[in-house]
Amino acid sequence: MDKPRQENEEEPQSAPKTNEERPSVEHSPEKQSPEEQSSEEQSSEEEFFPEELLPELLPEMLLSEERPPQERLSRKDLFEGRPPMEQPPCGVGKHKLEEGSFKERLARSRPQFRGDIHGRNLTNEEMIQAADELEEMKRVRNKLMIMHWKAKRSRPYPI
């Protein structure tokens, strides 16, 4: 009776040997090359941040990067924490959600974009004057288009 017990005890000892060999053969997924990991991180960031939303999130992302690592929010948390916008982004930016006339918004945005307009630094008065000129040109163009349309259709026969 002692011999079968000893044989039964030997079999379980041989089984762990095969189990010990298996982990050495398998490759853990943590041993990926750093290039693969960085490309995966980039693709996840691209999926999470559509390009048209990046300009709006940039100030918040920069603020979170200035904080110490323990206080820093991850980019995904930063994106999810934003309140939903009233209107979807339309490529123009968030100015459609702001109040005020075009000239007022232009004067308010000046400090952000100083020197961006063809390398010139304009005063608020110069910017407002340029906006007035643009609005005047739009009005004249619309008047000319209306006059042309009326002249075209006032004839008894088509041109």
Swiss-Prot record:
Keyword tags: Nucleus, Transcription, Transcription regulation
Pfam families xrefs: BEX
Residue ranges of the TM segments: none
Compositionally biased spans, kind Acidic residues: 37-54
Biased composition (Basic and acidic residues): 18-34, 64-80
Region: Disordered, residue numbers: 1-98
Annotated localization: Nucleus
InterPro entries: TF_A-like/BEX (IPR021156)
Broad class of the protein's primary localization: nucleus
Keyword DNA-binding: no
A single cellular component GO annotation: nucleus
Described purpose of this protein according to its UniProt entry: May be involved in transcriptional regulation. Modulates various viral and cellular promoters in a promoter context-dependent manner. Does not bind DNA directly.
Membership in a protein family: Belongs to the TFS-II family. TFA subfamily.
Name of the protein in its database record: Transcription elongation factor A protein-like 1
Name of encoding gene: TCEAL1
